Amino acid sequence: MSASTRNKHSKIHGNEKLDITTDEFDRIRQALSNEEFRKLFFDYVDEIQDPENRKLYEKEITQLEKERGVDVTFIHPQPGFVVKTSIDGELKCFINIASSTVVERPNNEVSVNSQTGQKGLSWSIPMAQTPPRDDLDANNKQCKVFDVVFHPDALHLGKRNAQFRQCLIDTALDGVEREYKVNLDRANLKFPKLDYKGLARPTVLRKLSKDATAEELEPHPLEHMYPKKPAANADQPKVLPMKTKVTPAPTFAVPKYSIKHSHDVDLAEYTDELDAKLQVTMPRALVVEIELPLLSSTADCQLDVTEKSVYLLSERQGAKYRLKLDLPYTVNDKAGNARFDTEHRRLCITLPVVRSTAREQRNLHDTVRVLTREDSGVELNSNGESPVEDEAEAEVEADAIVELQSHDQRDVSDAFPPTAVVSPRSFLKDNLHYKLPASFDCNILDNVIAFVLHVPNVQPDSVQTLQQARSLHLQFASMGSGYYPTHYAFLVQLPDGLEPQLQIDHIDVDAADENVVLRLYMNENCMLLPSYLAGPDSTDLKEYPVFGHFNNNNNNEKEYEGCSLASEKSLYINMDHNDLEHALEVSIMPQESTDPLDSIELLQQQQQQLQQLQQQKKLNKKQRKRNKKQRSLSESACEELKAAQEELQLQHEKQQQQQQLPSTPKDASPERLQNVSQPVDTLKLPQRKQRSYSECNESSSCVQRGILKRFSRYGPRPSISDSCSSIDDCSSTYSCSMDAPGMGFSQSFGGIPEERSGEGDVGLSESCKKTVRFNDHIMKQVFRLDSSILGQRKKNQKRRDCKLRAQQRRLSEGDSADYEEVEHGNGQQPPAHKTAANAQYFKQPNNNNGHDQDKNKKLSMHDSGLDLTNNNNHNNEEETKRNEADAKNAMMFEMDDDDEDEDEDM
């Protein structure tokens, strides 16, 4: 159905549908096809439109009505201006503001406002109205036209004064709305450039004659054919009441809308399941239809949809709409759609409804049941308790507020609404069985008491808390392996006699897959709290110490009762923090049960001790800042080091005595001999992190080590046996941490040499200073930007092989013979792969082998005459192998340097 057809049959028109038969339609068609009939018809139209004929027609009508005792006056409206609006937001409407001398003049009088006392003018503006008539707009669509006629003086005043013009417009709109029961859109008024809409048609004013004769008052035989006579008071005009309050003109119009509930046919709702009809009354979607007749498109329209509302705004001039609509159900605003029908100018919005799950429905029914039971106002004293006691308990319980924590960020609560006030008695449901968590931990840090409840698979939406001043009640549910929920309850309460000033400020609950973490934030520090009360409810509370892990199984209850912690004697826990030694000393001592007053005095003493310790810490910090530049050991540390030296000297003496024995096992190795020579009772000194040489590397003990972890590029490197032996030595309590005083350095400080305060001082000085020396030589490695490191390494390896082969070809027979004699003279068989170039690096160390042995022997002798090297041939062999390996490494590094120089030259 088109818009014109729908408006034609609207109730606004008041016209009945044209009922014409087929026979009548054929007769009209045949008559119009006759030329003579058409000519007569056009003559009739011209006769009606002729002004002279119209005057004659009005004169005859006036004479006829006078014979009936009715005075008739014709009003001919003169053009003024036009106001365009709409009726009920459906149909266009034009109001012609016209003028006629027949209408009385507007008059005014001075009046006083009764509320403000101000003087002003009270206007009386007469007007005449014509019945609405149908017409067509510029688009040939049907519209309504109303005529409101004023005196010409009123229009003249309106042209000169804008306020009076607005008063004329408001008076015309009020008259049309009250006379014809329509609703005009005052927010979207338009003023087209027209003087008059349509053809001007005269209207008639009828009133009874004042001097009517008896014949005129008699009923006419054709009375039923004439218009109805006016009433006796028809000559009195209708007076519209003056508006006492100025109603502001609305800036936006509210469009007409409708909300439809859309429901699909679901065959699952017709089954015999218990939850089949839970969602029957809830629609699948909401369809919102908004009528926007002044909009041809939604380009200038803004639409915002939320879960519970729809907001529409149009700021287009002449089509200002604003609508804020609350929806009856929660909808999914992300999945909705909107469509604008340009033919009917209707906006259709489809929004799917968010349906609650079966679990939420059951929780909702439980909430209604609980609220109905608690708000019924009827209480039965079945236990014989007095009403006064119940009122006192109710006042205490009124302070408890349930805090619902939703970890899924949903608006639907589980068991209680957020604003419900719940007492501790009604916090746990009577129809459920609650268990205490099997194991939980408790710890305190500053003002936070943390509980870890070891319960897996906790449902986050089942966590509920009841917070009071000195207690907290927690309940939650865990889903087991058989998908059956297990309900838990945990009540923690502070003892009444301990720390009465402590109160719970706020809480934090975190439910994870493996446990539940409960944090209580107190109003002040609670580190001195010795114990707390815990249980499933207030009737089954037990006292637990603060620090520890507790199991609540039945098998462990007997062991807990026999434990000293569960005895009646309380425990005294003292913690001392030493900043100098970076240690925390914890002492736990049982003490006899004392009175609450004695415990309070004990807590005060502990607080005083803590304050004294804090003051002492501040003094120690200041002293450390003053002595920051002096890096020295204390006297006690030096005494311990001296004692360690004496003990090591005794160990070396015992080792020498055992080595002088004639009988030694054949398979005895130096490591086994050292293990045998170790004394049974070792020196009990505090174990420290240390780096030390292996005891088998005695020949290199005379060389001072640096503090760098990386070895020098050209210096000797320890072999695999050295590193292995050093790892074995670390297992001892004080392995090789102190050397003889005459060796010039101490290995307990990482091989850094120490300066002596005096030449004659044999022992360690009180201030053992550490010195660091650096080498001025800078080693560098150059890499090309356009090549990778691995590729360059392979390239250098090829160059190195070519260089070695070239050196072998250039060597004379005499040089190669000398190298062979050197190898055979040392009693070693030269390997097949060793070249002459390699031999020049082995020649010097092997020839000086005997001299190095004598030198090492002299250096290894202590000032007291003790030989610390054990004079083993095995050590000499190991030394020779290490020297060969170091020489090879040195040769390889020198070749790398040569290659780098060649690359730079290239």
UniProtKB/Swiss-Prot annotation:
HAMAP family: Kintoun. It comes from the Eukaryota. Transmembrane segments: none annotated. Residues 639-655, 851-865, 875-887 have a biased composition (Basic and acidic residues). It holds the Pfam family PIH1_CS. This is Protein kintoun. Required for cytoplasmic pre-assembly of axonemal dyneins, thereby playing a central role in motility in cilia and flagella. Involved in pre-assembly of dynein arm complexes in the cytoplasm before intraflagellar transport loads them for the ciliary compartment. Residues 837-850 have a biased composition (Polar residues). InterPro entries: Kintoun (IPR034727), PIH1/Kintoun_subfamily (IPR050734), PIH1_N (IPR012981), PIH1D1/2/3_CS-like (IPR041442). PANTHER family: PIH1 DOMAIN-CONTAINING PROTEIN 1, PROTEIN KINTOUN. GO terms for biological process: axonemal dynein complex assembly; cilium-dependent cell motility. One of its GO terms (cellular component) is cytoplasm. Residues 894-906 have a biased composition (Acidic residues). Residues 614-691, 793-906 are annotated as: Disordered. Interacts with Pp1alpha-96A, Pp1-87B, Pp1-13C and flw. It is found in: Cytoplasm. GO terms for molecular function: protein phosphatase 1 binding. Keywords: Cytoplasm, Phosphoprotein. The modification Phosphoserine is found at residues 376, 812. Its main location: cytoplasm. Signal peptide: none annotated. Belongs to the PIH1 family. Kintoun subfamily. Residues 618-631, 793-808 have a biased composition (Basic residues).
